[in-house]
Amino acid sequence: MDKLPPSMRKRLYSLPQQVGAKAWIMDEEEDAEEEGAGGRQDPRRRSIRLRPLPSPSPSPSAAAAAAGGAESRGAALGGAADGEGPARGAAKSSTNGDCRRFRGSLASLGSRGGGGGGGSTGGGSHGHLHDSAEERRLIAEGDASPGEDRTPPGLAAEPERPGAPAPPAASPPQVPSSCGEQRPADAAVKVEGGAAAGDQILPEAEARLGQAGFMQRQFGAMLQPGVNKFSLRMFGSQKAVEREQERVKSAGFWIIHPYSDFRFYWDLTMLLLMVGNLIIIPVGITFFKDENTTPWIVFNVVSDTFFLIDLVLNFRTGIVVEDNTDIILDPRRIKMKYLKSWFVVDFVSSIPVDYIFLIVETRIDSEVYKTARALRIVRFTKILSLLRLLRLSRLIRYIHQWEEIFHMTYDLASAVVRIVNLIGMMLLLCHWDGCLQFLVPMLQDFPDDCWVSLNNMVNNSWGKQYSYALFKAMSHMLCIGYGRQAPMGMSDVWLTMLSMIVGATCYAMFIGHATALIQSLDSSRRQYQEKYKQVEQYMSFHKLPPDTRQRIHDYYEHRYQGKMFDEESILGELSEPLREEIINFNCRKLVASMPLFANADPNFVTSMLTKLRFEVFQPGDYIIREGTIGKKMYFIQHGVVSVLTKGNKETKLADGSYFGEICLLTRGRRTASVRADTYCRLYSLSVDNFNEVLEEYPMMRRAFETVALDRLDRIGKKNSILLHKVQHDLSSGVSNYQENAIVQRIVQHDREMAHCARRAQATTPVAPAIWTPLIQAPLQAAAATTSVAIALTHHPRLPAAIFRPPPGPTTLGSLGAGQTPRHLRRLQSLAPSAPSPASPASSPSQPDTPSSASLHVQPLPGCSTPAGLGSLLPTAGSPPAPTPPTTAGAAGFSHFHRALGGSLSSSDSPLLTPMQSAARSPQQPPPPPGAPAGLGLLEHFLPPPARSPTSSPGQLGQPPGELSPGLGSGPPGTPETPPRQPERLPFAAGASAGASPVAFSPRGGPSPPGHSPGTPRTFPSAPPRASGSHGSLLLPPASSPPPPPPPPAPQRRATPPLAPGRLSQDLKLISASQPALPQDGAQTLRRASPHSSSGESVAALPPFPRAPGRPPGAGPGQHVTLTLPRKASSGSLPPPLSLFGPRAAPAGGPRLTAAPQREPGAKSEPVRSKLPSNL
């Protein structure tokens, strides 16, 4: 009740309580005994008993109370019929159920009851009086100690004025009967004593009594255990502490609890006093001859007084029984137990020797006594004073108690406290031993063979004597010598041996405690070292290779980080709320970095985290292998992993992502392999726990299924089970709009994280700056993209702004606001294929080279053609169109004009605006009316005209107006001009994450046996996806005879001619570390795109002729199909050359042609553009 707030206590006091008469009312004999004894009551009673103060004038009510009549305790309040009868003592039932007597006039009692005080006697029903002043006093003084008597509060609240008439009462006052007993109506008691009677309680007396009660309550509370951290740990709860307080109250008067505040401060005082005594007394006895000084006597007298008081308090202090952790509070048991344990030692150490000497000196004042004391009693007094050193036992007991207090209250390591105590005890023993080394020779009057006489230190100062004595004692105790010299006398020899024994014992104890302390400070690291020693012995026993041993060592370092502990057993011993709190704290970074958890229900996150298991993987470890049965899914806390498929498609996942959930959802086999690229710290979730959690949260199951479908779509795979589930959920309307938005947000976050992981893992090549959107776009569908970008960098009339990175936060920002990563992935051109067994690519050390000189590109079956290139390909039955000679050099560039020119000229990107403005400068003549639209930018990249001294007729460019709509296609039936110069053509290629199979067929010769022009041999490729086909960059046909030469093109003054080989040299700078191609064949090129894992491009491979007319091994009309390799190491890349340089199309060389090869009667498939509109 002491710790309850005032409002709560007021509510408790105001509650009506129906308490039985036997519980709270004394019988008549007890009442008589109480009044006869002056109001004393049993201290073991817990109810608040209040007695009235004696009235100044004799009152019949007091006599009636002494007689013990029942009417004087509980009769209803009544008065005489005429209103002026004398008042008698009336009993009133207070709101807390206690019976308190009130004295006063009828008017005052009636006013407290809320009614009048006169009239006839009437029986009162059982009601309750409501007096705010009385309630406030009851609350203030309700917590009385068991043995105190107090005046009932509220009596002197309203003193009556003498002679004041009683106000008339409308009805008789209804006073509740005594403590719940219903009195009959005729049990009226005559009330005597009017208003003039001076029987009111004075406020001063009440204040004095209240102050005395307050001090007694405060001092009583000091003897009880307080509600603090130490007591709560000892007893378990605040309720148990309150029960212990009640035990102290009921145990008797002046019983001190061992965990009370008073005992705490008393023990602290005695601890300091004992330390002072144990240090000062040996020095005073040994080195000071005059012991009659005032400071010395005062110190001894005060010390003896405190120790005597402590001896008395030990008889009233509870004793803690260490066997059953019970506390003895019975005074008789405390006395018997203390007499049997430490009483004798404490009494001997507390004998007041100085008190005895002072009493004797005051009574016997003679010179004979003083001389006798100085000569004979001095040795006895010194030896008797040594008994005070037995107080060391109290010091040890108090220190042991304080060790427990520090260990339980402040969580200090008990080993540290023990080390400090051990050091203090060693220093104290050294101090005593030093004093003893000087005291023994002094008691012998310094013989000649003692160390003091040999060193001539008899008459030196006490400081010098103490220093040499302490040095001699510590030399003995540490066993390092005998001091300045070896002992000579017999007493010195025995003292030296005693010092050695004590010192060796203390030294051994110190070493043992120090070792335990060091081991306990870092036990987890010691366990790790012991465990790793076992691992090393295991590796040595099995003779594991050094690289495996190093991997095992690295694994242990990253997994345990030098500390080993059983985390599962630790968490299993904790309560469930504490376990969840610790797991949430350990996985806070995982939750913060994972969009799946950030948008999920907190209960789902907690349920998922409590079932996770921590694992560590090294770089190169396959966490999941394709085709195996999945039993776990993984959440990435730190690290980067690669998701690999059989098509060699790779996806990066980084911190905050997860994988392996597809087989857990479909109960099938793994659809991809996952390899760790760095050290990965993962959390795994078993399939049973996964399904258990998702059964409770169906919305999160739909999110997992949707993300799994999106990931399968990104790697080119499908799953009918997941697709059916998702479509069923969407059609049935299970989820609402908010849940669908959360699922879409989770899918979008997963795509962005995969894109960021690819960017983080990509290495930036050392190359000249090129147009960033062309490189960082997730789509590089043509080999000429690299050539166009390089041409952009060398064009002198383009502004420098286009060579800077786009201003958006991400690379995808330059691709258009409406294009999401999903749309871009669906627009990518992919063509995975397997290399031929006969191809040189089967050997990793050999380059992949084509075996034909004149190659022809054809699409594979089932693959659609980009829309931008659809107009370049004639149908199966149409003859090829003739190509003018003037446009032959720009044939390769014309393909890109058709595919990209329109979108470049019509793009709204801010980066392309200066390009369009620069395309139409005032120095250029306007294009003819028949020129196709969209050539403002690309016309600057045409080679210089025939007037250049380093250019040939095959390298001439022409204005936009002279470019035919067919982009190098002439009238049908025109024969093709054969090549005349046997010069090798340069070779340009573009690369991305994958390579597409390209079918090349030479023109102009008969096919060899086993081959036909209509059905060229192709290698197998992956089936097309629903989201898009794998297309190839096709070159326009050039098999028809050349048309008559057109008129020469006018010279363009605004565009300076490019230097010979300039673009080729610049391309060589980009990949200078790549070796040259072999002379007998061309090598395919594949370079991994740093920003896209799914986009693929095709290299346009020009022929490498060996003879002027025909390449060796290839006849007219022979078709040769080549497959670009999947991977090409950095050492197998050819030196890149430009298609548009001076050596791009030499006169007389074989012309690179391309035409779609279809079977007879095959219908042309509709083509769709796979290029983004703003590229």
Curated annotation (Swiss-Prot):
One GO BP on record is: potassium ion transmembrane transport
Question: For the region Disordered, what residue ranges are annotated?
Answer: 17-186, 801-820, 830-1175
Keywords noted in UniProt: cAMP, cAMP-binding, Cell membrane, Ion channel, Ion transport, Ligand-gated ion channel, Membrane, Nucleotide-binding, Phosphoprotein, Potassium, Potassium channel, Potassium transport, Sodium, Sodium channel, Sodium transport, Transmembrane, Transmembrane helix, Transport, Voltage-gated channel
Its post-translational modification remark reads: S-palmitoylated.
Please give the chief subcellular localization of this protein: membrane
Spell out the Acidic residues composition-biased ranges.
Answer: 26-36
Give start-end positions of Basic and acidic residues composition bias. Answer: 128-140
- What tissues harbor this protein? Highly expressed in the heart sinoatrial node (SAN). Not detected in atrium, ventricle, forebrain or cerebellum. Detected at very low levels in total brain.
Recorded hits in CDD domains, A to Z, give: CAP_ED (cd00038)
Q: What are the binding positions for 3',5'-cyclic AMP in this chain? A: G660, E661, C663, R670, T671, V674, R711
Positions binding 3',5'-cyclic GMP in this chain are Y560, K563, F565, E567
Q: What residue spans carry the Pro residues bias annotation?
A: 162-175, 1038-1050, 1102-1114
Keyword Transport listed: yes
Query: Which reaction does this chain catalyze?
Result: K(+)(in) = K(+)(out); Na(+)(in) = Na(+)(out)
Instruction: Describe activity control.
Output: Activated by cAMP and to a lesser extent by cGMP and cCMP. cAMP binding causes a conformation change that leads to the assembly of an active tetramer and channel opening by shifting the voltage-dependency towards more positive voltages. Binding of cAMP removes a tonic inhibition conferred by cyclic nucleotide-binding domain (CNBD) on channel opening. Cyclic dinucleotides can modulate HCN4 channel; cyclic dinucleotides acting as potent antagonists of cAMP. Inhibited by extracellular Cs(+) ions. Auxiliary subunits can also regulate HCN4 channel.
Source taxon at top rank = Eukaryota
Mutation effect (H407A): Reduces response to cAMP
Q: Which residues lie on this side of the membrane: Extracellular?
A: 289-292, 353-374, 445-449, 479-488
What biological function has been recorded for the protein in this entry?
Hyperpolarization-activated ion channel that are permeable to Na(+) and K(+) ions with very slow activation and inactivation. Exhibits higher selectivity for K(+) over Na(+) ions. Contributes to the native pacemaker currents in heart (If) that regulate the rhythm of heart beat. Contributes to the native pacemaker currents in neurons (Ih). May mediate responses to sour stimuli.
Query: Which family is this sequence assigned to?
Result: Belongs to the potassium channel HCN family.
Q: What remark about domains does the record contain?
A: Contains six transmembrane segments (S1-S6) and an intervening P-loop. The segment S4 is the voltage-sensor and is characterized by a series of positively charged amino acids at every third position, while the S5-S6 segments together with the P-loop form a centrally located pore of the channel. Contains a cyclic nucleotide-binding domain (CNBD) in their C-terminal region. The CNBD is connected to the pore forming transmembrane segment via the C-linker.
The record's note on quaternary structure and interaction partners says:
Homotetramer. The channel is composed of a homo- or heterotetrameric complex of pore-forming subunits. Interacts with PEX5L with a 4:4 HCN4:PEX5L stoichiometry; reduces the effects of cAMP on the voltage-dependence and rate of activation. Interacts with IRAG1; regulates HCN4 channel activity. Interacts with IRAG2; regulates HCN4 channel activity.
| Protein name, UniProt field | Potassium/sodium hyperpolarization-activated cyclic nucleotide-gated channel 4
